[in-house]
Design a protein with these regions (language model features):
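Cofactor-binding beta-sheet edge motifs in enzyme active sites
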Residues: 1-146
Length: 146
């Protein structure tokens, strides 16, 4: 099990994430768990913030693993969610969302979480394989150890 960290400040909130991943000898990636700490300034409904953080990881991880827009004959091939790949429930890692309101500025909770998903996973992949990946989606990369 390898870990990667990422943090950002955006939309008035601070977010840090730790991704735990493993990479098999065949180069198959498994994201086991993500822990995210969010400071949105104020937390009127902490359970709603936790749910928003969890949902944002679905979007952020989907983009990191699969997300791309492809063209064929001058047209975009993806027209809606039925033909745009997203993370399936059985691929979703455990997510632990920690809400840490500081009493500061009222910030967003979904958008900044999306921004730490890919960097946390990529840093964990680097810890596991020694590879620095600079282009997404991950589905185009061999993750065999360097």
């Amino acid at each position: 099990m390898f870990r990667g960290l990422a943090q950002t400040m955006g939309f008035g909130s601070y977010v840090a994430a730790c991704a735990e991943v493993s990479v098999s000898d065949a180069g198959e990636l498994t994201v086991h768990r993500i822990v995210a700490a969010t400071d949105p300034g104020h937390a009127v409904n902490p359970q709603q913030i936790e749910a928003q953080v969890e949902g944002s990881f679905v979007y952020g991880l989907s983009a990191a693993l699969y997300g791309e827009i492809t063209l064929k004959d001058g047209r975009i091939e993806q027209s809606n969610f039925h033909d745009y790949p997203v993370l399936h429930m059985d691929e979703m890692p455990a997510v632990e969302a920690i809400v840490m309101p500081s009493g500061g500025f009222w910030g967003g909770v979904g958008e900044p979480t999306i921004a730490v998903a890919a960097p946390a996973v990529l840093n964990a992949i680097f810890a596991a394989t020694g590879q620095r990946i600079r282009e997404l989606p991950l589905k185009h990369h061999s993750l065999k150890k360097a």
